[in-house]
Amino acid sequence: TRAIRGVRSYPSMLDVPDEVDLAVVIVPAPAVPNVVGQLGERGVKGAVIISAGFKETGAAGAKLEADTVAIAHQYNIALVGPNCLGVINTDPEVRLNASFAKGTPAAGNIAFISQSGALATAVLDYAKGQDFGFSKVVSLGNKADVNENDFLYHLWHDPDTRVILLYLEDLADGGE
């Protein structure tokens, strides 16, 4: 193993000796399906795909995204993204920042779901100087697998969330 800025790193998911609950994938888009396959072989059940270069780029990217989702479904992996900022949970028992946001926001009772990573970043930056915080922050990106309906259901039942902010560019399944 090697270390990057003091953190152990591995050349492949298959080389990681520990159990992995959630993977944050930030590799070039063409490498994502292979990485998701490795996650499946390791039994990982959740992944945040931050990488861009999927359906937002056209037909070839859309096929790459569909292939990635098919591999994830084969292994029962829930995917957030691709092309997203990531996810944040401010619960002190969890304290997860699986994103490339600059820092973790203050804890609060507002959940924020945004399809746009740029808007999520702007809202998080604005919130730093204000008197409110977030319970959860989710950037959906392309919504290739997990979508706003999945998160809305979870957040509706989340005791740490009293308000849900939502920014969407489209609805995954309006009838749901």
PLM regions and their residue ranges:
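Catalytic-core regions of core metabolic enzymes
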Residues: 1-176
